[in-house]
């Protein structure tokens, strides 16, 4: 794949103040990257699931004061959007070659080289988790650690292929219609928030439906084609050298695959967090459930929440402000596998 030649930078109204969008040209099309935070800090890259961008996939986590203080204190965030999934994206030409899952993986290398990043922390959800895991297998020296949300590792099952085919054909001929939105909503969320004849949908799901209306159907179709052509990387997981934490809702259609990934990685360098009554998108549905496991995971890299947040009574992280349930994860329905981390290469040095 050809390396990036040029980039366009524009001010971007993000849920992080000061975020800037960069459009980076790669050998298989352009990719949008929104950079948030101090670029002198260690980098964390994110990659979302099908039909989502960084805001609709990760906003719940990053707008939480507790999680935001932990992540933005320690990292500069590079939100990578799938081609054509950024806000206001134009429709990619129907005759343009559809990138493979390997192409999307290699685009990440172009992004890292463009920003002159060395080893990065990675956070991905569902299809985005697959792409970042594949990237970690291919370019292990460029990955410090993995934060995976409802990850997948196998080729599509017959059931998934059926739904992908249905979604693909409907997108192609009818666009982002109600059927497609319904299929995607149940991919993302648990029945607890999707509603029923007696209980209305949650505001979160209603907001997601509205965001899906803004997605370009051709661009979503192209991402789906790449996802549907993925290969099984289960056996290659054994070669992963980086520390990994996995979050998965027990109602996620990818729950079993997430457990299999955790089993393949073993407990020496991975941790599994199962969230009760939650779908695939833990970052949106139950972001508070990620806080303590994330904090413990990042401690293995020498990273921490800033003292000024954790000790100040005015801070959202002050003891009087923390929901008592956060101190006792089992009360939130979390099943935690002990985090056993062995020594491995540390993230890029923090520059003062």
Swiss-Prot record:
State the similarity comment: Belongs to the NDRG family.
| Tissues where this protein is expressed | Pollen.
Gene of this entry? SF21
Point out the coiled-coil segments of this chain: none
Q: Which Pfam families match?
A: Ndr
Superkingdom, according to UniProt? Eukaryota
Can you name this protein?
Pollen-specific protein SF21
Alphabetical list of InterPro entries matching this protein? AB_hydrolase_fold, NDRG
């Amino acid at each position: 794949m050809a390396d990036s030649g040029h980039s366009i930078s524009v001010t971007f109204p993000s849920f992080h103040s000061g975020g800037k969008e960069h459009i980076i040209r790669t050998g298989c099309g352009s990719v949008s990257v929104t950079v948030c935070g101090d670029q002198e800090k260690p980098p964390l890259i994110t990659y979302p699931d099908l039909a989502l961008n960084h805001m609709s996939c990760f906003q719940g986590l990053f707008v939480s004061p507790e999680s935001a203080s932990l992540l933005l204190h320690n990292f500069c965030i590079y939100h990578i959007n799938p081609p054509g999934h950024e806000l206001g994206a134009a429709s990619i030409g129907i005759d343009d070659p559809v990138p493979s899952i390997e192409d999307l993986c290699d685009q990440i290398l172009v992004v890292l080289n463009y920003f002159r990043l060395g080893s990065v922390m990675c956070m991905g959800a569902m299809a985005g988790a697959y792409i970042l895991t594949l990237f970690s297998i291919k370019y292990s020296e460029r990955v410090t650690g993995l934060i995976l949300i409802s990850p997948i590792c196998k080729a599509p099952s017959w059931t998934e292929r059926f739904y992908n085919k249905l979604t693909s054909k409907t997108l192609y001929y009818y666009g982002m219609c109600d059927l497609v939105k319904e299929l995607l909503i149940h991919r993302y969320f648990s029945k607890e928030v999707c509603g029923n004849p007696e209980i209305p949908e949650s505001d979160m799901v209603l907001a997601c439906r509205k965001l899906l209306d803004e997605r370009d159907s051709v661009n979503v179709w192209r991402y789906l084609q790449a996802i549907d052509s993925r290969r099984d990387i289960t056996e290659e997981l054994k070669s992963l050298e980086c520390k990994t934490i996995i979050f998965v809702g027990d109602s996620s259609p990818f729950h079993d695959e997430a457990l299999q990934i955790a089993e393949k990685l073993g407990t020496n360098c991975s941790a599994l967090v199962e969230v009760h009554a939650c779908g695939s998108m833990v970052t949106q549905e139950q972001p508070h459930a990620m806080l303590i496991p994330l904090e413990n995971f990042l401690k293995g890299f020498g990273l921490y929440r800033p003292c000024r947040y954790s000790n100040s009574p005015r801070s959202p992280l002050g003891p009087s402000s923390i929901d008592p349930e956060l101190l006792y994860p089992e009360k939130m329905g979390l099943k935690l596998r002990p985090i056993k981390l062995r020594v491995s290469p540390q993230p890029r040095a923090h520059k003062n």
